[in-house]
Amino acid sequence: QLAGDDKEKGIIVTSTTTGEGKTFIASNLAMSLALLEKKTIMVGLDIRKPRMAELFSIGDRQHGITNILANEECNWEEVKAQIVASGVNHNLDLLTAGPTPANPGELMVRKSLKQTIALLKEHYDYVIIDTAPVGLVADTLQLSKLADRTLFVCRADFSTKSSFTYINKLDEQKKLPNISIVINDIDLSKKKFAYSYGFGKYSKNGNRSFGFYGLFSNNTNDDSIKI
């Protein structure tokens, strides 16, 4: 569905809190689009606790978007200089978080961030943005006007039902664009009927750390999501 909509180029991937698997989901979405021959870039905007470079086994932690956001404005050559190849598919590039700044909140409201995302949309079919958990910091809400769609990641047997109240509130108030929910880490042995896909950790040597994500059922007295 995403690959067929040329107007929805910028996609935020977020969650309520840490540990729900948003970076895994973002990386799998980016890789899936790349395999469909879509020129894709994944952007690491969880700049307080970045995991993207580790996930793709990128040893260079000096390049990244924080170098761009250190300035108020930017151009394509400056953005391009911070982009690295993913090493797993020729259609997938990465703009990792880069060095951790002392003022992450300030960087998220700079004009250079808006310019960076706009430039990436000009040069790529899809821009997948891995953000900070929206329930912990307000950074992600600053991106609402820069993206076209939001994938909100929850984790089975981990995320609470109150997360859905929060997501509904964000949707009603138009805090994030076009929210869709992804349920991550489903145990298929516990559910007779499941709609799921595999995902894994990407590296130059192949995939590992496999799990599942898909639809959910919340018919339970427990506060966590039961699948």
Protein language model features and the residues they cover:
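P-loop NTP-binding module
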Residues: 1-227
